[in-house]
């Protein structure tokens, strides 16, 4: 199978691609802007594998939760490849590849959103729960002390010092595993139907709401 998989939901850009004979994977850490390099890296991947977008059997896209800007860049890029050639897309929750590498039975994955708030998802007996966006206080009210709190960044785990914590390492290999399993199970959709998991409003939307509430 020929495929291209991308996740731009965090400061670690994950990519994986295959020409049906071999595959390449890449993890680029601590990126502030995905837009500046994503198209370039994708072209390099496809050139290396000697395939074109029209050759792809499917695409994979991390739909979040995470960086609003990063998700817009990633999903618009995937749509731009999918739509001209009618290539099906496998969407996946960006927390699921992270969960794949965790050995604990019960844990929660957290990723910081705006100040004092986190995206989070519990995995009890490794079964995923609902993806939520809450304040630190609200999260702690709902979490049992026995659960392990996991995050990709040490500075985010500081807010959960009264819990057992675990530092995650984003992996394009685990991302590929999740997406290939989903594709084989028929979990695909059209690029037209690809939607992000935003959960929170952007700063611009918050400011807009604030200005309009003062007018009324």
Predicted regions located by residue number:
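Phosphate/pyrophosphate-binding loops at sites that engage ATP/ADP/AMP, CoA/4′-phosphopantetheine
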Residues: 42-58, 142-147
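Short, structurally constrained coil/turn elements
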Residues: 52, 83, 159-161
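Residues at secondary-structure transition points
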Residues: 29-40, 68, 72, 76, ...
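DPxDG-like acidic metal-binding loop motif
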Residues: 58-89
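Stable alpha-helical structural segments in soluble proteins, enriched in small hydrophobic residues
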Residues: 45-49, 78, 84, 172-183
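Oxyanion-binding and handling regions
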Residues: 1-22, 29, 33-35, 90-216
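Short, well-ordered amphipathic alpha-helical segments that serve as non-catalytic structural scaffolds
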Residues: 34-49, 95
């Amino acid at each position: 199978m020929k495929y291209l998989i991308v996740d731009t939901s965090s400061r670690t850009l994950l990519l994986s691609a295959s020409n049906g004979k071999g595959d390449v994977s890449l993890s680029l850490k601590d990126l502030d802007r995905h837009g500046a390099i994503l198209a370039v890296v994708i072209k390099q991947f496809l050139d290396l594998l000697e395939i074109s977008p029209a050759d792809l059997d499917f695409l994979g896209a991390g739909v979040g939760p995470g960086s609003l800007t990063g998700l817009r860049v990633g999903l618009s890029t995937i749509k731009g490849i999918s739509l001209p050639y009618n290539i099906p897309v496998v969407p996946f929750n960006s927390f699921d590849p992270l969960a794949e590498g965790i050995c604990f039975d019960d844990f929660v994955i957290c990723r910081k959103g705006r100040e004092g708030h986190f995206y989070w998802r519990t995995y009890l007996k490794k079964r995923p729960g609902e993806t939520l966006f809450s304040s630190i206080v609200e999260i702690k009210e709902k979490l049992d002390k026995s659960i392990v709190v996991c995050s990709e960044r040490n500075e985010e785990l500081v807010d959960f010092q009264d819990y057992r914590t675990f530092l995650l390492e984003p992996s394009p290999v685990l991302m590929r595993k999740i997406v290939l399993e989903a594709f084989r199970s028929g979990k695909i959709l059209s690029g037209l139907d690809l939607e992000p998991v935003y959960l929170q409003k952007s700063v611009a939307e918050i400011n807009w709401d604030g200005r309009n509430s003062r007018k009324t």
